Amino acid sequence: MIDIILPDGSVKQYKIGVTGQEIIQSLSISLFKKTIAVEINNELIDLYIPIINTATVKAITIDSVQGIEILRHDTAHILAQAVKKLFPDTQVVIGPVIKDGFYYDFARDKPFTNKDLEVIEQEMQDIIAKNDLIQREVWLRAKAIEFFKQQKEFYKVKLIEEIPESEEISIYRQGNFVDLCRGPHSPSTGYCTKYFKLTKVSGAYWRGNSKNEVLQRIYGTAWEKKSDLDSYLHRLSEAQKRDHRKLGRELELFHFQDEAQGMPFWHDKGWTIFKIIKNYISCQIQRAGYIEVNTPMVLSQKLWEKSGHWEKFRENMFTLDTNVAEKDHNLIKDSIETKCALALKPMNCPGHIQIFNYTIKSYRDLPLRMAEFGSCHRYEPSGALYGLMRVRSFVQDDAHIFCTEDQITDETIKFCHLLKQVYQDFGFPEVKIKFSDRPEKRAGTDKIWDKAEQALIHAIQTLGEEYTINRGEGAFYGPKLEFILTDAIGREWQCGTLQVDFVLPERLNASYISSEGSKKRPVILHRAILGSFERFIGILIEHYSGRLPIWLAPIQVAVVSITDEAVNYAKQLHQELIDNNIRSTLDISNQKINYKIRNFFTAKVPLIAILGKKESESGKIAIRTLGSQEQQVISSSELIAHIRKNKK
């Protein structure tokens, strides 16, 4: 007999070789009906795997986070099985679970169509209805390689060859379909939900490397309940309507083109938004005691080697071949294989330390809060680029706080206050905090880590904020906080960060004179609120569906005339608004008023000032607000006051 320890701490005895299925069934039939896998000693395994030693056992139900992930993993395998049946010449590659769904990569000459997805979905429903057993088998490496070679599944062969010799080769069989997989899975295909949807097809490089062949990736989502699926599809539909790439084109904010992949061309209205945000942040950090600096965009390879970025980040850096540059100053190479002396900065921190080191610092100078709207460049594979959300050139609202260990808590509290105010002003009142503690491989002593972790946690607790812990997810040089905001359709975006760093001050020889007169290393707090301006603007566009609040709108008021008699009054009002630093545009064309209103509302202009003969004679303004059919009659001074009241 063996002891089985249950989640409530109680211990029951079972025969050696008992399965998780038998244990859960003996405890509760209602629990068993919802269980699709078990957790044995903190490891997820299939329900029918024998247990031969004393173990802790926990049921994984279909309505749990882990259960939903297994359900989605099952659905990915069923997708692959359906594709193999319908399109036998297709090679199946990999099919992991992702946030809210799954995908499976396929190698196939002919592209999948939307009609194909419909046929595949029906075949998947048929597979679920058959309720075939899903069985795990362990094969010898040679047998697995030979089997998949015979099946002409050459990607599976490559995957098996990459599995370490110490690991077993696990295979899952359902019906006549066999796939390489670690598992776990449900007991049969009938456990899998019928509430799934294949959402799209896209290209994906094998292994994410642009030098490799392009595969076809079918994305899908799966949920326990129909209501959950419907809710997700509604959010997906809303997200498509709000897509910042589409709105960016329609509103003439920015565009991308092949000659500068991943680098936005900002149009006047988009650049206006950019400048508004920059000016706002600049004012906020000035009030919070930051100094604002600017550091070179191109820095020597030697500095990047000292900082450690060259070793760890080189593949993501754009480099400049100075030998070639002497002949052609415009030629910049991004090949990492070329020995280069200069690199475009991917981050601002080494430059900030150069400014810190330029003069001798005393403990009285700390904390020193140094900010920069630094223009950075990072190489991202072309397949990973995604509008403003994933770019190669970007501006960060970056800052570094040079402080002592004893100042970490106070500086964290001050930063959190600043961050929450900024998010509130931009329309994101809810902020989630994640705390990432020490990883297994790390720099610094346990004593330093203890102090830094306790300082961050004490700051969060002092603020009365809830937080979740990401065990072992801190950087090797220090613990960190991540700040996540939620948009209008419930999506979460990680934007803000605060990262404690013990390592960079040592590498770049940053020091200050302590109260005892000795040299000491400062702690650096890397922190950002928005992250990159580009990504944050993309988030704002989608959050507001392009209808930015008055203070952020590139055009705040459109002044339009109805009749020729009102043209001079319209010009006068337009100029008055401009003189009061209000972003106004003027339309005195002969187009019909409904056409003008429709055009400006399509352009998401918050306010339209409509002027006819009546308004011209009275000196009043008929105001229409975006999304409203009603008109309000006010004076120009009232309009100006209204807009100023909304200014942040």
Swiss-Prot record:
SUPFAM superfamilies (UniProt xref): Class II aaRS ABD-related, Class II aaRS and biotin synthetases, TGS-like, ThrRS/AlaRS common domain
SMART domains, per database record: tRNA_SAD
Cited InterPro entries: aa-tRNA-synt_IIb (IPR002314), aa-tRNA-synth_II (IPR006195), aa-tRNA-synth_II/BPL/LPL (IPR045864), Anticodon-bd (IPR004154), Anticodon-bd_dom_sf (IPR036621), Beta-grasp_dom_sf (IPR012675), TGS (IPR004095), TGS-like (IPR012676)
Enzyme Commission numbers on file: 6.1.1.3
Cofactor: Zn(2+)
Entry's localization field: Cytoplasm
Entry GO MF terms: ATP binding; metal ion binding; threonine-tRNA ligase activity; tRNA binding
Binding site for Zn(2+): C349, H400, H526
Binding note for cofactor: Binds 1 zinc ion per subunit.
Record domain TGS: where: 1-61
GO cellular component: cytoplasm
One Pfam family hit: tRNA_SAD
Region annotation Catalytic: where it falls in the sequence: 243-549
Coiled coil: none
UniProt keyword annotations, A-Z: Aminoacyl-tRNA synthetase, ATP-binding, Cytoplasm, Ligase, Metal-binding, Nucleotide-binding, Protein biosynthesis, RNA-binding, tRNA-binding, Zinc
Swiss-Prot/TrEMBL GO biological process terms: threonyl-tRNA aminoacylation
Subunit structure: Homodimer.
Family: Belongs to the class-II aminoacyl-tRNA synthetase family.
NCBIfam families the UniProt entry points to: thrS
UniProt name for this protein: Threonine--tRNA ligase
Organism encoding this protein: Orientia tsutsugamushi (strain Boryong) (Rickettsia tsutsugamushi)
